[in-house]
Amino acid sequence: MAAKDVKFGNDARVKMLNGVNILADAVKVTLGPKGRNVVLDKSFGAPTITKDGVSVAREIELEDKFENMGAQMVKEVASKANDAAGDGTTTATVLAQAIVNEGLKAVAAGMNPMDLKRGIDKAVIAAVEELKKLSVPCSDSKAIAQVGTISANSDETVGKLIAEAMEKVGKEGVITVEEGTGLQDELDVVEGMQFDRGYLSPYFINKPETGSVELESPFILLADKKVSNIRELLPVLEAVAKAGKPLLIVAEDVEGEALATLVVNTMRGIVKVAAVKAPGFGDRRKAMLQDIATLTAGTVISEEIGMELEKATLEDLGQAKRVVINKDTTIIIDGIGDEATIQGRVAQIRQQIEEATSDYDREKLQERVAKLAGGVAVIKVGAATEVEMKEKKARVEDALHATRAAVEEGVVAGGGVALIRVASKIAELKGDNEDQNVGIKVALRAMEAPLRQIVINAGEEASVIANSVKAGEGSYGYNAYSEEYGDMIGMGILDPTKVTRSALQYAASVAGLMITTECMVTDLPKEDKADMGAAGMGG
């Protein structure tokens, strides 16, 4: 086992504080509408330029191991805030730095660290309650656009795109961000259910100009098995041909003789057919087939429940207004499924989301809800260079998380104003002893830090503006972008309540642990022993 280096008391805390300050100083220059960029060197390719706090934090590793421990703990604050709300990473870092700096001053002055931490925790619990009272629901698309704009660093086009996407696919809809091909940002909305499986044979194509298959008012056969024998399909094909409608077959696979016969029938114009593989694998495939059945009022033909493909009738088939299939995707538009049944299915999947343990499962279930409930929107980010593209894509993703958080828990006045108002509301809070009271004051003072940092980044005098804002009431604050005072909510400067709450809770949690640190242990650097010179050979 390697030898260890151990530091105690003030020596340890000073080193840790240096690390906290180095990381936080690098992150906090990005805060607010006039925050600056940080350039991150990459071992290959062009450097990354970012205004995203957590991206900056993740890059920082310090040479001194004790300082690095402090930096890594603050990095944890930014990561946790990012995981919980998807934004507010810089605010969380600024709050943590303020609490640690003020708290360690109090420890150096002889206060009991454990009571300080208890005081800080009391203040945060009270502050979160007050934040909830200040919160306003975020329901209309104007407010959603404003939240998106603020989170994307005052980029209005991004805010509008996100609001438009949410309007089209609903609050539950899946919105994804992709790299576009042009200079302009674009929004693609896919209404209906889309899944990532294309046609099984290019001979099904009936729209050569777009390379796609389009079926109008088709019947949809859903089979949870491989189909290789055409005999199994004949009864259904004959019934569909009599009805004079096209047919879409969604099965685990269609191969061999069955696929060849379908292709020949299609090319001769006897019956219009297209076949695709069912989406997903294993149990997820069964569930997604059931989703399609719910959407199209069909039945999944599965041998598990004793149904045979040869005995399927038109009543077992689903129907939709239109189906579009290209090389990689299938879209089912306007299934004839009953709205109440679809909502029941959605509620069932939501229950599974609540119980899901892994993020991956949760994400997949969320996608299924979106496909049943609304649709899928894709925001394609446009930029002139790859460096700009990466930076912009990260901002748009942040803005998307922020708007989701706003819809979930509502919004409060932005620009650091909400925390100032909360601090004044709980100014009379008292702890069980004097040291806890100092802890409460540490937390209250730290709540001013985000506003001060926004003002400093805008090149103004922090104390003057902080005092003016404190003298005001409600959502009165300072707009650093236009350099004027006024009603923050009226000016559209909003922060999601969830983002502000998460930032405060995670900052206080980690900062409280750092204040109560008394000893730090790390590995001693290994000394490289000089290689022995090779012995001379006798001649």
From Swiss-Prot:
SUPFAM superfamilies: GroEL apical domain-like, GroEL equatorial domain-like, GroEL-intermediate domain like. Its EC number is 5.6.1.7. It is found in: Cytoplasm. It comes from the Bacteria. It holds the Pfam family Cpn60_TCP1. It catalyses: ATP + H2O + a folded polypeptide = ADP + phosphate + an unfolded polypeptide. GO terms for biological process: protein refolding. ATP binds at T30, L31, G32, P33, K51, D87, G88, T89, T90, T91, G415, D495. One of its GO terms (molecular function) is ATP binding. Keywords: ATP-binding, Chaperone, Cytoplasm, Isomerase, Nucleotide-binding. GO terms for cellular component: cytoplasm. Coiled coil: none annotated. PROSITE patterns: CHAPERONINS_CPN60 (PS00296). Together with its co-chaperonin GroES, plays an essential role in assisting protein folding. The GroEL-GroES system forms a nano-cage that allows encapsulation of the non-native substrate proteins and provides a physical environment optimized to promote and accelerate protein folding. PANTHER family: 60 KDA HEAT SHOCK PROTEIN, MITOCHONDRIAL (PTHR45633). HAMAP family: CH60 (MF_00600). NCBIfam families: GroEL, PRK00013.1, PRK12849.1, PRK12850.1, PRK12851.1. Forms a cylinder of 14 subunits composed of two heptameric rings stacked back-to-back. Interacts with the co-chaperonin GroES. Belongs to the chaperonin (HSP60) family. This is Chaperonin GroEL. It comes from Serratia rubidaea. The lineage of its organism: Bacteria, Pseudomonadati, Pseudomonadota, Gammaproteobacteria, Enterobacterales. The gene is groEL.
